[in-house]
Amino acid sequence: MESFSSKSLALQAEKKLLSKMVGRSAAHLFIDETSSEVLDELYRVSKEYTHSRPQAQRVIKDLIKVAVKVAVLHRSGCFGPSELALATRFRQKLRQGAMTALSFGEVDFTFEAAVLAGLLTECRDVLLELVENHLTPKSHGRIRHVFDHFSDPGLLTALYGPDFTQHLGKICDGLRKLLEEGKL
């Protein structure tokens, strides 16, 4: 059985970041049960696609680190008005990407890797612009790593292919729930 857990990794990252910050509102951060399940499925897809456990772990770790850092910045009020507009745009693009991924998963023969890859690339670019003055170049590299990995047309084609049907179903279930709850 796989011992990797995105939830425990997220909690470790939260603790590390929060140990350097003050304020209780920062304590309620990123990961809930549904998000954890989606991240775990993304990990499994990455591991099967790349045939590399360390590479799959690295991309999910990078995703969690970036998400926690952006959440901390947002909750700490570090974003100015123009950056809050970028944050709204990022959330809209991410939501659009999730709805597109769901649509491709639910309606046969509609999948187009270029469309989903394009949406993920747009998300990456908006997020990089948002955190440009707040995070280090190392964090910018993590953002590029995560979005470049998941916008890879080969990975997307495999995900929507017959070998990954079970993973895609679980990811779509999680995305649907996150959208319904307004968390995406």
From Swiss-Prot:
Coiled coil: none annotated. The modification Phosphoserine is found at residue 3. The keyword Phosphoprotein applies. The central region was initially thought to constitute a DED (death effector) domain. However, 3D-structure data reveal a previously uncharacterized fold that is different from the predicted fold of a DED (death effector) domain. It consists of a large, hydrophobic central cavity that is poised for cofactor binding. GO terms for cellular component: lysosome; nucleus. Gene3D superfamilies: Tumor necrosis factor alpha-induced protein 8-like (1.20.1440.160). The gene is TNFAIP8L2. May interact with CASP8; however, such result is unclear since could not reproduce the interaction with CASP8. Interacts with RAC1. This is Tumor necrosis factor alpha-induced protein 8-like protein 2. Belongs to the TNFAIP8 family. TNFAIP8L2 subfamily. Acts as a negative regulator of innate and adaptive immunity by maintaining immune homeostasis. Plays a regulatory role in the Toll-like signaling pathway by determining the strength of LPS-induced signaling and gene expression. Inhibits TCR-mediated T-cell activation and negatively regulate T-cell function to prevent hyperresponsiveness. Also inhibits autolysosome formation via negatively modulating MTOR activation by interacting with RAC1 and promoting the disassociation of the RAC1-MTOR complex. Its main location: cytoplasm. InterPro entries: TNFAIP8-like (IPR008477), TNFAIP8_sf (IPR038355). Phosphorylated by TAK1/MAP3K7; this phosphorylation triggers association with BTRC and subsequent ubiquitination and degradation. Ubiquitinated in a BTRC-depdent manner; leading to degradation mediated through the proteasome pathway. It comes from Oryctolagus cuniculus (Rabbit). GO terms for biological process: innate immune response; negative regulation of inflammatory response; negative regulation of T cell activation; regulation of apoptotic process; T cell activation. It comes from the Eukaryota. Keywords: Cytoplasm, Immunity, Innate immunity, Lysosome, Nucleus, Phosphoprotein, Ubl conjugation. Pfam families: DUF758. It is found in: Cytoplasm; Nucleus; Lysosome.
